[in-house]
UniProtKB/Swiss-Prot annotation:
The keyword GTP-binding does not apply. Keywords: ATP-binding, Competence, Ion transport, Nucleotide-binding, Transport, Zinc, Zinc transport. GO terms for biological process: establishment of competence for transformation; zinc ion transport. One of its GO terms (molecular function) is ATP hydrolysis activity. It comes from Streptococcus pneumoniae (strain ATCC BAA-255 / R6). The keyword Cytoplasm does not apply. This is Zinc transport system ATP-binding protein AdcC. Residues 4-234 form the ABC transporter domain. Part of the ATP-driven transport system AdcABC for zinc. Required for transformability. The lineage of its organism: Bacteria, Bacillati, Bacillota, Bacilli, Lactobacillales. GO terms for cellular component: ATP-binding cassette (ABC) transporter complex. PANTHER family: HIGH-AFFINITY ZINC UPTAKE SYSTEM ATP-BINDING PROTEIN ZNUC, METAL TRANSPORT SYSTEM ATP-BINDING PROTEIN TM_0124-RELATED. ATP binds at G36, E37, N38, G39, A40, A41, K42, T43. Belongs to the ABC transporter superfamily.
Length: 234
């Protein structure tokens, strides 16, 4: 099922074109990476696709329902989330638990299934053993993993991730990529992830969308084949 469709999107800053004629899509059960050199407007494309920034022209269609006919839920993880207010008076467990309420309902009590899901979310990023620590005591990488665990606790249908493995070591990165691959292929999630290093994730992602440009022209979007060759518009 197609969750996100972007057609002929163009975005301008102060009348200067940044993105031009962008076309791409993301389906349920698919893990897609978005790459491009530094300054390639990857984050701008994500924000324009989500409506955080208003594209100048083009169409963005996001499905209203998931594969079960329920309201589609999207989790967006922006870049540098480790800089969030870690002075928030909460333990890691309480922080991750708060991510469950939008799915459950703010005024409904969590049951044993919810608690199991919270534990699994913490386990998935190696944070269960840190569950009783205060957010303010965490390292940058641990804060990143705590925010990711909270995102998992909300059980979204679509993951939009902007360089989510910042601050993680190589082993933790591979575990995260495997987790996202599993979420897509075994649970029908749609994953769109910005990464600066496509080589790290090539064994896990289904395809890569690459932003390129010629000289000073705006960035355009291309699919990248397994052999690294550009094969046309995404």
């Amino acid at each position: 099922m197609r969750y996100i469709t972007v057609e002929d999107l163009s975005f301008y800053y102060d009348k200067e074109p940044v993105l031009e004629h962008i076309n791409y899509c993301v389906d349920s059960g698919e893990f897609v990476t978005l790459t491009g050199e530094n300054g390639a407007a990857k984050t701008t494309l994500i924000k324009a696709s989500l409506g955080i920034l208003q594209p100048r022209i083009g169409k963005v269609a996001i499905s209203k329902t998931n594969t079960q006919g329920k309201k589609l839920r999207i989790a967006y993880l922006p870049q540098q989330i480790a800089s969030f207010n870690a002075g928030f008076p909460s333990t890691v467990y309480e922080f991750v638990k708060s991510g469950r309420y939008p799915r459950k309902g703010w005024f409904r009590r969590l049951n044993a299934h919810d608690e199991e899901h919270i534990k699994a979310s913490l386990d998935s990023v190696g944070m269960w053993e840190h569950r009783d620590k205060r957010l303010g005591s965490l390292s940058g990488g641990q804060k990143q993993r705590a925010v990711i665990a909270r995102m998992f606790a909300s059980d979204p249908d679509v993951f939009i991730l902007d360089e989510p493995t910042t601050g993680m070591d190589a082993g933790s990165k591979n575990e995260f990529y495997e987790l996202m691959h599993h979420s897509a292929h075994h649970h029908g999630k749609a994953v769109l992830m910005i990464t600066h290093d496509p080589e790290e994730v090539k064994d896990y992602a289904d395809r890569n969308i690459h932003l390129v440009r010629n000289q000073d022209s705006p960035w355009r979007c291309f699919n990248v084949h397994e052999n690294g060759q550009e094969v046309g518009h995404a």
